[in-house]
């Protein structure tokens, strides 16, 4: 059997010779905590941030592969008072740079640096969008939380295919040299209806119950 992220991928799999009755469009399993309903206000209270400010979650994988300082500098030029939840993973050097930048920053944004965290689901519940590499797990967690995605630097192969699927179905945008992060964020936030449309699309395509569906299928086949 082949487990896929969505029914939208069934045709592609069949075209590659996989029998349709062997395709299980259950979605990608994620930790059950990403399925729990957590209000924005509750999530913000847990993090100690303002629930009424536009909040951007910046991630770069567990190794922190992203230039967060450069991204914050670009986004702060938009003029909107954002809150940045900056997750640096195990990249202690990047965490230090973000902490130093935050300590000397004098603009109208708020910067919250983090190292490796275990409460990504809370951060996603408190955020308006996520800026991240398109790794399969992060993408699946964001889908479960209906969190619009701005993606960068996909690895050739599976991450590029993740980007194609998400962008083609209106759930994400790809940050490039010709479509930089500040333009991507501005376009996402300048029209509130667009954010709502993206979230609605994600809720229709996401399978937050993927883990339960897959487990039930396996138990039936025993």
Q: Where do the language-model regions lie?
A:
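Active-site-proximal region of nucleotide-activated glycan assembly enzymes
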Residues: 1-37
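Helix N-cap/beta->alpha junction signal
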Residues: 5-8, 90, 135, 177
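Donor-nucleotide binding loops and adjacent catalytic segments primarily
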Residues: 38-42, 47-126, 160
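C-terminal "capping" alpha-helix adjacent to the active site of nucleotide-linked donor transferases
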Residues: 167-170, 176-193
């Amino acid at each position: 059997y082949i487990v896929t992220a969505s029914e939208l991928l069934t045709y592609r799999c069949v075209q590659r010779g996989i029998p349709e009755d062997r395709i299980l469009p259950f979605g990608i399993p994620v930790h059950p905590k990403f399925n729990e309903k957590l209000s924005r206000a509750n999530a913000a209270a847990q993090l100690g941030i303002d629930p009424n400010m536009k909040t951007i979650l910046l991630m770069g994988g567990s190794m922190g592969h992203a230039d967060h300082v450069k991204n914050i500098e670009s986004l702060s030029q938009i003029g909107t008072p954002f809150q940045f939840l900056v997750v640096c993973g195990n990249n202690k050097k990047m965490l230090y740079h973000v902490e130093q930048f935050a300590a000397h920053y004098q603009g109208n944004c708020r910067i919250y640096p983090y190292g490796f965290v275990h409460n990504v689901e809370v951060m996603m519940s408190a955020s308006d969008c996520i800026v991240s590499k398109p790794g399969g797990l992060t993408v699946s967690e964001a889908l479960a939380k209906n969190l619009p995605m701005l993606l960068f630097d996909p690895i050739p192969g599976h991450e590029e295919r993740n980007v194609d699927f998400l962008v083609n179905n209106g759930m994400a945008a790809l940050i490039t040299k010709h479509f930089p992060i500040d333009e991507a964020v501005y376009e996402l936030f300048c029209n509130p209806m667009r954010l709502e449309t993206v979230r609605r699309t994600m809720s229709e395509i996401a399978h937050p119950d993927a883990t339960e569906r897959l487990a039930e299928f396996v138990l039936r086949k025993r």
